[in-house]
Amino acid sequence: MEISTLQIIAIFIFSCIAGMGSVLDEFQTHRPLIACTVIGLILGDLKTGVMLGGTLELIALGWMNVGAAQSPDSALASIISAILVIVGHQSIAIGIAIALPVAAAGQVLTVFARTITVVFQHAADKAAEEARFRTIDLLHVSALGVQGLRVAIPALVVSLFVSADMVSSMLSAIPEFVTRGLQIAGGFIVVVGYAMVLRMMGVKYLMPFFFLGFLAGGYLDFSLLAFGGVGVIIALIYIQLNPQWRKAEPAASTAPSAPALDQLDD
């Protein structure tokens, strides 16, 4: 599959938006589910984009910045892996093996880009002292543009030079135990991501359902739609039986009968 010039331009524009979205966190364009889906739509393979994005989204559930520590770059990993998988006609498992090291490399690029933006912030402080508000706006937009180019430039390079033969040759050069290990690690990261989210939410009472889901997934030959339906049914039953969600029934008050009143009078 060859990428056309129009597709390359569209990938570059969306990569800029995804890179800026990883800082703004408003429209979540940097999340794998959105990024891979849009790349799949641009390259004409929406199904593969959605499948890869959904798989990577599960892996990236636990990726979050903690203080000055930067998380792996989900935007760069999603876009690069989606391009290589769709153009090279590779499997979703290969996409996971590609995304993990790319996310680690993007983490380094993120730190480098944030270091560069410090220069813009100092310049904005100086402009604020001189009441040059248009300069402040320009510096803020320029700093945001650095974050966009952080993802767009690697995506542009890959889009310009990638081909199906190149992807196959590159993957053939990687030892099988490396790609297999990355695929297994990707499966473990999904579990760890779910566990981190549940622990952060502080809902220990949901842990039995967490383990029940993985046991059912391992031993029952159900489709995802069937698992979703079973999950909804269990959730509804749980809400109906849990005293926390049940409305308190008003106590019935009955007036004493006439004979009872007569006995009290006696």
Curated annotation (Swiss-Prot):
Main location: membrane
Membrane topology, from the record: Multi-pass membrane protein
Chain ranges of the PTS EIIC type-4 domain: 1-237
Induction section of the entry: By L-sorbose.
UniProt KW Electron transport keyword: no
Keywords, comma-separated and alphabetical: Cell inner membrane, Cell membrane, Membrane, Phosphotransferase system, Sugar transport, Transmembrane, Transmembrane helix, Transport
GO BP terms: phosphoenolpyruvate-dependent sugar phosphotransferase system
Compartments reported by the entry: Cell inner membrane
A Gene Ontology term for the protein's cellular component: plasma membrane
Transmembrane residue ranges: 3-23, 33-53, 79-99, 100-120, 151-171, 183-203, 219-239
InterPro entries per record: GatZ_KbaZ_carbometab, PTS_IIC_man
Free-text note on domains in this protein's UniProt record: The EIIC type-4 domain forms the PTS system translocation channel and contains the specific substrate-binding site.
Function statement: The phosphoenolpyruvate-dependent sugar phosphotransferase system (PTS), a major carbohydrate active transport system, catalyzes the phosphorylation of incoming sugar substrates concomitant with their translocation across the cell membrane. The enzyme II SorABFM PTS system is involved in L-sorbose transport.
The protein, known as: PTS system sorbose-specific EIIC component
Organismal lineage: Bacteria, Pseudomonadati, Pseudomonadota, Gammaproteobacteria, Enterobacterales
